[in-house]
Structures are given as C-alpha cells and as structure tokens.
Amino acid sequence: MSPFTAGPAPARTPRAEEGDTPATRFDDRLAEQLLDQRIVLLGTQVDEVSANRVCAQLLILSAQDPRTDISLYVNSPGGSVHAGLAIYDTMRLIPNDVSTLAMGFAASMGQFLLSVGTAGKRYALPNARIMMHQPSAGIGGTTADIEIQADNLDFTKRTIERITAEHTGQSPETISRDGDRDRWFTAEEAREYGMVDQVVQSLADVRPAATRRRMGL
C-alpha cells in the first residue's frame, strides 16, 4: 500500500490504510447502469480498491468507444496519493476526454482528480465543497530510513504541485503555499482558482459528448 496520503495521518498509520474500500460496498447493478451512461463514480476514499475499479472502468469504456467522452463524478475525501496518480495516469492514457464533476465533497486527492479532468470539461455542483492540501506520511525508523522517506515525500509533493499547477494555471509555488494548510473552496471559488471550468445545475451541461481522438481521427 502507498505510504503517502494527501492529508495528515498519525505516524506510521496513513489514512488510506485505516480501511481500504471493500469491493462489495459499491452496488454492482448501479455501477453497470452508470457505465451505460459512460459515468464513472468515485464515491469513496481513494485507495487501491477504488482506484483499481475506476481505472478498470475507464479502460473498459475507452475500449468500447474511444471517441466519446467519459464522465468522472467525484464525491471523495481523498486518500492514497499513489492510488490517485494511477487514476490520473489512466485518464491521460486513454484517448477519450474525461470530464469531471464535483458533487458534495472533493477533498485532497478528490480535489486533485477533479482538477485534472479535460480542460473546459471540469464541473462542480453549486453546493459542492473542494479542499486542497499537501500530501503527508508518517515517517519513522532509522536516521537513514527517515532521510529516504523524507526525500520520497518531497518528490511526491512536488509532483502533485507540478501537475496541479499545469491544470489550474496557478504556479507550483502558489499551489505549495495555498496547500500548506487545509484550504477550502466553494464551487465558485474553485472556478476562479482554475480547479473547475463551470458551476452547473443541469445534466445537459455535463452529459458525455462525442469527441475526436486526441491522437487524430
């Protein structure tokens, strides 16, 4: 399991390890109905189980139709950085545009995944709350172990800052400063910051649409 979470955690006990999302928690029949609409729902913490599910659904939908948008709906408190990066890399891997929608609560890695949707297709519902902060991890062991873990945490932090900056238009320095403590955004504030492109109230605004392949027709 990833030792890094996008949020504070007790020493040696990362938040994502406090209880990975059981596979049975998600209603399979409901998931199938959403997939028929090309909608992937991340409605839990980001951990190995939920990330594998989301990645698999993105890959399946892309294989079925590589030209039509896929929607990722986010209502998540965040969790494992490495699990979240697996989802991000899969979003970049497939040729489809992936729109994102914040519904309810998008915090930490939930905020990250919301922000990295396809430009122009990142949405938030009016009463959604978005929270950004830095990755963290419990660090312990020998002096050498602590140095290695600290270097790895710094690398992870810089990676998240760089990617977030690329997708929001903010500088990495601004992302680092603003994420030093929990920073909360309303949907409109998230739009102004560059995390989302539009605050929406209608399904017509976020319904998946046919799109060209990123690499050509």
Swiss-Prot record:
The GO terms this record gives for MF are: ATP-dependent peptidase activity; ATPase binding; serine-type endopeptidase activity
Q: Which reaction does it catalyse?
A: Hydrolysis of proteins to small peptides in the presence of ATP and magnesium. alpha-casein is the usual test substrate. In the absence of ATP, only oligopeptides shorter than five residues are hydrolyzed (such as succinyl-Leu-Tyr-|-NHMec, and Leu-Tyr-Leu-|-Tyr-Trp, in which cleavage of the -Tyr-|-Leu- and -Tyr-|-Trp bonds also occurs)
Q: Which GO terms describe its biological process?
A: protein quality control for misfolded or incompletely synthesized proteins
Q: Which residues lie within the region annotated Disordered?
A: 1-23
User: Which residues act catalytically here?
Assistant: 108 (nucleophile), 133
Q: What is its EC number?
A: 3.4.21.92
Q: Which UniProt keywords apply?
A: Cytoplasm, Hydrolase, Protease, Serine protease
Write out the similarity annotation.
Belongs to the peptidase S14 family.
- Quaternary form? Fourteen ClpP subunits assemble into 2 heptameric rings which stack back to back to give a disk-like structure with a central cavity, resembling the structure of eukaryotic proteasomes.
Q: What is this protein called?
A: ATP-dependent Clp protease proteolytic subunit 3
